[in-house]
Amino acid sequence: MEIIDMIKSPEELLQFMNDNITYGFVGKNGKKYTNMNSPDWNDWYQVCYVQNGDEVLKSKVGTCWDQVELERAWFIKNNYEFKTIFIWFEVSGENDLPSHTFLIYKKNGKYYWFEHAFESFKGIHEFNSESEAIQFVKDKQFEFALKNSKSAKLEDLAYLKAYEYPKPKDYLDVDEYLMHVTAGKYNKDKHL
């Protein structure tokens, strides 16, 4: 029996991830990158590929993009209603503005943001609606960008977009992944 099959609740999944999964990425060469302050981290765009859930379990390392695929696998196996969301700043030209992926699931009429990769918000957060959850994450992402991005400006908030996206193909590089997630359903809700 796979370890993932022994996990019986979202809370247990979060605890498992807390105990076993580290933020970072795996390069196409199989090398694990976990030190964001290392000069090697600067190469992520060229060397990173998006892992599927099984690969994250094996490597024990993943970006939010990867970790959501592990979460997706568990939520599918356990018959939850959920969506995966990608948010990013749609600005032209090179920039250091962050993107984020996350999972929202529905249970007993409530919506829950399941978060492991966004360190300061690690946990399961309850909301009354899907749009409320997405807006909350967007607000936190914007605050994070203002604190951590050299290029972030207040007017960038207007360019922070959310996309619901389906499971990506295996072994996508960064550009392929970005094309996949931004081809998803653009969330045009007036509250977003």
Features from the language model and the residues they span:
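A structural boundary/capping signal
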Residues: 1-192
